[in-house]
C-alpha cells in the first residue's frame, strides 16, 4: 500500500491562488501515473486573513501544519493592504526559521523554447544549482535604531553566522556537488567584509577537506555576478550566505530567460519539520484575476517536492512535460503566447498522464 503524503497547501495571495491549483492538477496526474497518494490540507493564511484577524496566521499555526511532510506554497504579499515586511515576517520567514528550513535550493536551467538574454546560449549550457543559507547570516533581524528623526539617527543591523549554520549548508552543497559534476563554487566578499567573510572562507576550505573528489573555487560576489552573465556554463553548484544567495538566486534564473518560471525549495534536510516549495515569482497583484499567470514556476516547484519526497522518476516526468510545453506550447502571455493559466496546467498534466 502506498504511503500517504500529508501536504499543507497555502496558495497565499494574488496569483498564488491561480497557480497553486495548476500545481495540484499536475501532482494529481503524477499520483495517478506513479501510484503516489497525497493528502492535500488547505489553509487560507494570507493578507486576506490579516485583514480579518490582524495577523498573517493563527497562533497555533505551527501545531496545525508542523506534522505535514511539506508545504506547497503559492505567493505572499498584497502591498495595498499589508506592508511587505509584515506579510513576509508574519508567514514565510516564520516557516523558514521555526521549521529550520536552512537550505534554500534553486535550480538554474535554460529550458527549450526559452530564449536567454545572454547571447548565443542554448539549452544544456546553463544548468546548475544555487544553495543559499536560509536562516541566519546577513538576515538576522538583530539590530535597532537610535535617536530616530534627528540628525544623530543611527541604524545598526548585525550579521550573525554560526559554525553549525555554516557547516550544515556547506555539507549539503558539497554532497550535492558530489552527485552532480563534482564542482562547487563559493560566494564570498572577504576583501571587503573583514570578519564574517574570511571566517566563511575558512569554513568552506575546511569542509572541502572532507570531499577530495570535489573541485572547488571561490569568487567575490561582485565578480561572481559578472561571471554568471559572461560564463554561466562554468557553474555546477554555487553555495552562498543568505544575502549573497538571495542576490544570486534571482540573477541565475534571469540569465536562463526569466524568473517567472523559476522554482525554489526551502528544505529541512533532516525532515524534523516540513519543507516548503514555492515559485520564485511574487503575488503579482497587477495581473491577478485575469487568468494569465504562468503556472510553470509552481509546477516545477512541485517537481522539486517530488524529488525531496523520494520520487525522482516522477519529478523527472514533470520536468520533461514542462520542457515539452515550453518548446511547443501552449504558452502564457509572458512567454509570447495567448494561453490561460489553466490551459498550460492542463497541457502539462496531460503530458504527465500520457508518459
Regions found by a protein language model. Give the residues of each.
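Buried hydrophobic packing segments
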Residues: 23, 27, 204, 298-306, ...
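N-terminal glycine-rich phosphate/adenylate-binding segment common to multiple enzyme folds
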Residues: 51-156, 243-245
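Glycine-rich phosphate/pyrophosphate-binding loop and the adjoining helix
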Residues: 135, 141-185, 190-194, 312, ...
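N-terminal beta-loop-helix "entrance" segment that forms/cooperates
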Residues: 35-59, 228
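Buried hydrophobic positions in well-ordered alpha/beta secondary-structure cores of metabolic enzymes
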Residues: 13-16, 69, 131, 173, ...
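Glycine-rich phosphate/nucleotide-binding loop
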Residues: 228-330
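Glycine-rich phosphate/diphosphate-binding loop of Rossmann-like nucleotide-binding domains
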Residues: 8-25, 30-31, 150-222
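Short acidic loop-to-helix transition motifs that present clustered carboxylates
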Residues: 113, 219-226
